[in-house]
Amino acid sequence: MLTLAALALVACGGSGGESTATTAAGATTTSTTVADTTPATEPSSTSSSAATSSTTTIPAEPVMPLTGLPITDPAAAQRVALVVKIDNHPDARPQSGLNQADIVFEENVEQLTRFAAVFQTNAPDPVGPIRSGRTQDVELLGSLNKPIFAWSGGNPGVTKAINSSDFVVANVQTNARQQSQSYRSRDRAAPHNLYAQGSGLFTMAPEGATPPPLQFNYRKEGQASTGDSSGGVDLKMDGVNVSWKFDAGSGKYRRFQSGKAHNDAALGQVDASNVVVLVVDYVPSPVDTKSPEAQTTGTGEAYVFSDGKVVHGTWTRNDRLNPFTLTADDGTPMLLTPGRTWVELARTDSTTPLGA
């Protein structure tokens, strides 16, 4: 089994109150050379599912750490990760920027879901609607190596948690307002109308900031996919039924919400090369008992939907600074297709793989 340890670009040289954050971040950008590898870590299990580890496999060629695709833009490859909290309320759809994100995490919040969209390859202009963060974001996003965290604030408890984290805090209504060029769209009602420019948010990276590590293991070029044939997956998320359906023509999964195509405002139906389902426990947030908090360290059930197939296994993660380790039931690594990935943080018994 491979450990998804920190690998920095090999060979590259609280409920949603919109109160303000108080921490300012650095505002200059610089390109830095990063180390080839870091030692693999040994994941530990917090339940009956145990896991072992070996050293991380180094890709045969330099790849983008959030997609596994070959590097075509060296400047983008040196950027830090940018996380934008994006609204999924019905009045916020269609959103802007989802089909430009390298990775999107879908989290349950308060009878809704919210997206943590992660960018490095692309700078989405515009991106949004941007909403508040949650305490679960601190644990979930720690493996991205001190990302820029773009949000609209949160209740006092959430704001304290985010400001105390290792994120570069970018509240688009306060300390990041100028750099992000944030604005309220006139064609939607608040609070579902707050947008920013991703290119501006990237300028908030502090001097010396480095790219994120590789987050998943990917199939090599020409390597056959494994697993059982599957047409996709149905998920019962909080407040919305989600379906991902495989399109053999494009090799991508297309997203549906409550029976309707889920669209990006500029780029058509939301799609992804991979859909990773992590079955997690949700507990009440320590700062707001009405807000669910996904537990993303420990271990749990996992599914990888890729190339029209599904592989079932286990996720493990012993620390928030480490990426998830995905291991199939037969003990082999769960491999993704290079490309964009959506990660669904699903509750127990909410996942139904579809037949071929």
Predicted features and spans:
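Bacterial signal peptide processing site
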Residues: 13-16
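Sec-dependent N-terminal signal peptides
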Residues: 1-5
